[in-house]
Design a protein with these regions (language model features):
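Active-site/substrate-binding loop(s) of hydrolase catalytic cores
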Residues: 1-98, 121
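Active-site-adjacent mobile loop/cap segments within catalytic or ligand-binding domains
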Residues: 24, 75, 101-150
Length: 150
């Protein structure tokens, strides 16, 4: 479990790291683009390298990512059934957003074939307590964790 992939972005309340790079566009994938905002090279950012190294070391059967604010369960790679099981346990619909350039979803789901779902939580959760978030989304999260992999 990696509680925060972008600690600098969390503190600054932005999706970009200290170098101004969107880490969720910095992974090696056929659809990746070399730009200042996505990184001038794949895995140019230490945070993305850490995630890749963790994937190499632990070889996860499934990846569960939590984002905001698109209000859905997205998936990449062989994860459609998992996404549907998760959505049955919360108020978020399954919505295939497509493989974003150099995203963790593109890398894990399409390049490595690891099922990945993304809880895209609603954007209006600023005043929701942790207890209420857990009450609202724990059944879905637990369903994802319990889902039979491979």
């Amino acid at each position: 479990m990696l509680p925060v992939a972008n600690p600098d972005g969390l503190i600054a309340e932005t999706r970009f790291n200290t170098h101004g790079v969107d880490l969720n566009r910095n992974f090696p994938a056929a659809n990746r683009q070399n730009t200042a905002r996505f990184g001038l090279a794949e895995l140019s950012e230490p945070e993305a390298v850490v995630i890749k190294d963790l994937m190499d070391k632990y070889e996860p059967d499934v990846i569960i990512s939590i984002h905001q604010p698109l209000n859905c369960i997205d998936y990449d790679g062989p994860a459609e059934d998992l996404a549907r099981v998760v959505a049955e346990n919360c108020d978020l619909p399954v919505r295939k957003l497509g493989a974003m350039p150099g995203s963790l979803g593109s890398y894990s789901g399409l390049v490595r074939g690891i099922p990945i779902i993304t809880f895209e939580l609603p954007g209006d959760l600023g005043r929701v307590s942790r207890d209420e978030l857990w009450e609202r989304y724990s059944p879905a999260l637990l369903a994802a964790i319990a889902y039979p992999a491979k």
